[in-house]
Amino acid sequence: MTLAKPGSGSQSRMDDKAHFKSRVIRDRATFAEEELGSSDVSDPAMVAAVETLLRGIGEDPQREGLRKTPERVVAALKFLTSGYRQSLEELLNSAIFDEGHDEMVLLRDVSLFSLCEHHLLPFIGKAHVAYIPKQKVVGLSKIARIVEMYSRRLQVQERLTRQIAEALMEVLDPYGVGVVIEATHMCMVMRGVQKAGSWTVTSSMVGVFQEDPRTREEFLSLIRHPSNF
């Protein structure tokens, strides 16, 4: 039998605690670096601006929980506004095809999030996008990418809806485009009137979707139909 030296158990527990604390600190540092991402998002002016905002609300940017917050906010804003650094040409990358299809193509329930340009608070929802091709069709994923590109900018929902429709008209020259967006706005939920559960619905109808009531009704009927998935 091995006899433990007096106090050795206490020392062992202290060593274990020190090791655990060191590991937690390392894990937090690793998590922070991963959250910031590997791409270079450093922007001293933006970081300084976030620090100024933190001081303005009475916080200390140098306290432990906030030391990396300015960099994280800058990284998040760059991601949420990445649509400014994209173009339709690069996005589509020649994914337009001659198919001779002339019936409605509908991509519904495309999830989206964007930042309201008035308060920089998010609005979150889904888009339904349809078009009737003359000759050219586009890969379905590219429609979702177009929604994403315009969403990742400072926006108002009305303009976002119109921009998606105009983009498809520009690249496909179809008989028409219909876009409906349903979204809930945090600027109405977290502040102001504070109405949780309210939704804003906007539409943009171009070409036959505006001119032909039957085409418009077919589109609206299809997006009202419950999904089977």
Curated annotation (Swiss-Prot):
Gene3D superfamilies xrefs: 1.10.286.10, 3.30.1130.10
Record InterPro entries: GTP-CH-I_C/QueF, GTP-CH-I_N, GTP_CycHdrlase_I, GTP_CycHdrlase_I_CS, GTP_CycHdrlase_I_dom
This protein's UniProt keywords: GTP-binding, Hydrolase, Metal-binding, Nucleotide-binding, One-carbon metabolism, Zinc
Keyword Cytoplasm: no
One GO CC term, this protein: cytoplasm
Record-listed Zn(2+) binding positions: 116, 119, 187
Pfam family, one: GTP_cyclohydroI
Gene Ontology molecular function terms on file: GTP binding; GTP cyclohydrolase I activity; zinc ion binding
Tagged with keyword tRNA processing: no
GO biological process, alphabetically ordered: one-carbon metabolic process; tetrahydrobiopterin biosynthetic process; tetrahydrofolate biosynthetic process
Span list, region Disordered: 1-21
Catalytic activity: GTP + H2O = 7,8-dihydroneopterin 3'-triphosphate + formate + H(+)
Source taxon at top rank: Bacteria
Pathway participation: Cofactor biosynthesis; 7,8-dihydroneopterin triphosphate biosynthesis; 7,8-dihydroneopterin triphosphate from GTP: step 1/1
EC assignment: 3.5.4.16
Quaternary structure and partners: Toroid-shaped homodecamer, composed of two pentamers of five dimers.
Family: Belongs to the GTP cyclohydrolase I family.
Cited NCBIfam families: folE, PRK09347.1-2, PRK09347.1-3
Protein name: GTP cyclohydrolase 1
